[in-house]
């Protein structure tokens, strides 16, 4: 429970912060373990899933391979410094996938909303997609080869 004298100031950003220096007491981040001098606790798995609405899949087909993805529309995330590109791993290793974007945003909720409106495929952390998968608004896609994002 929050004390009546406590002040909460929330900043939602993908930018990295320096705890203390930036007057930040608590940060929630996704990705790699931070420096040793930071106390970190794992909140959830950060595994990325490829997903789409059942209606999108009925209209455009279900991709099975990396090559199939190129015939679909991507809903891409823009990080603080660059577009977060999709990558696939084949027998030659990891390579960037040139899936044509239909929508680009730096807001995961906007990407999920577009996926739920049948606009394309989204590749986001499972924890963000979980409620939509559980309600059947989105379906997780398993390809023959692994897909992830460049970070």
Where are these regions (language model features)?
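Central regulatory/effector-binding core of bacterial HTH transcription factors
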Residues: 1-39
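C-terminal regulatory
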Residues: 17-21, 33-151
């Amino acid at each position: 429970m929050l004390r009546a004298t406590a002040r909460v100031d929330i900043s939602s950003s993908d930018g990295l912060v320096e705890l203390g220096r930036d007057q930040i007491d608590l940060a929630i981040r996704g990705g790699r373990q931070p420096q040793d001098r930071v106390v970190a606790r794992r909140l959830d798995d950060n595994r990325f899933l490829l997903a789409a609405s059942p209606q999108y899949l009925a209209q455009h087909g279900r991709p099975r391979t990396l090559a199939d993805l190129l015939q679909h529309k991507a809903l891409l995330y823009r990080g603080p410094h660059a577009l977060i590109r999709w990558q696939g791993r084949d027998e030659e290793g990891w390579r960037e996938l040139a899936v044509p974007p239909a929508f680009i945003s730096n807001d995961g909720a906007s990407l999920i909303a577009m996926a739920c409106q049948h606009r394309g495929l989204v590749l986001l952390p499972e924890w963000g997609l979980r409620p939509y998968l559980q309600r059947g608004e989105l379906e997780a896609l398993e390809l023959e080869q692994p897909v992830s994002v460049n970070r």
